[in-house]
């Protein structure tokens, strides 16, 4: 009869994320890579979370569910491929947050960048997000124009 500790019941979780649903193949590859890594280390994975959304978006449903489980002391380890797959900015803060709940994060591809390289990557990420937003606004503007034209045609009886 052994003592069942809380630590034994805590889960190892794989978290994989891509920005858009068009990247499903990339997500699948990311998950397989992480599963292979965990298997090679003898880690038994309890759940595999596949998420879609920008790394700048803090309102990702599955990501927030994961953080809630961290706060409930359900998660022992989170395994991610890269820091930016977890969160684009503020990774260090979230890592410390997880540590407060005795949750570790394993970054499989933990490349160390110089401060200059990191800054360049951050700027590129920001530019990418804003260019996507501008594209989305143009698309929305085009839709409004088309809707206005349809409304005019309906008013004219066409």
Residue ranges of predicted features:
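Short, structured surface patches at the beginning of a domain
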Residues: 1-158
């Amino acid at each position: 009869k052994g003592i069942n500790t809380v630590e034994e019941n805590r889960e190892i979780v794989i978290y994989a994320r891509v920005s858009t649903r068009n990247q499903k193949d990339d997500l699948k590859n990311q998950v397989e890579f992480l599963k292979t890594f965990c298997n090679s280390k003898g880690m038994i994975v309890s759940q595999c979370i596949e998420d879609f959304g920008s790394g700048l978006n803090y309102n990702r449903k599955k990501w927030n569910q994961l953080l809630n489980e961290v706060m409930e002391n359900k998660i022992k380890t989170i395994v991610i491929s890269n820091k930016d797959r977890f969160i684009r900015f503020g990774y260090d803060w979230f890592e410390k947050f997880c540590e407060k709940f005795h949750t570790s994060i394993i970054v499989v591809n933990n490349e160390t960048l110089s401060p200059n390289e990191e800054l360049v990557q951050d700027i590129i990420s920001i530019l990418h997000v804003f260019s996507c937003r501008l594209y989305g606004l143009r698309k929305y503007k085009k839709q409004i124009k088309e809707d206005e034209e349809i409304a005019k045609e309906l008013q004219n009886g066409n």
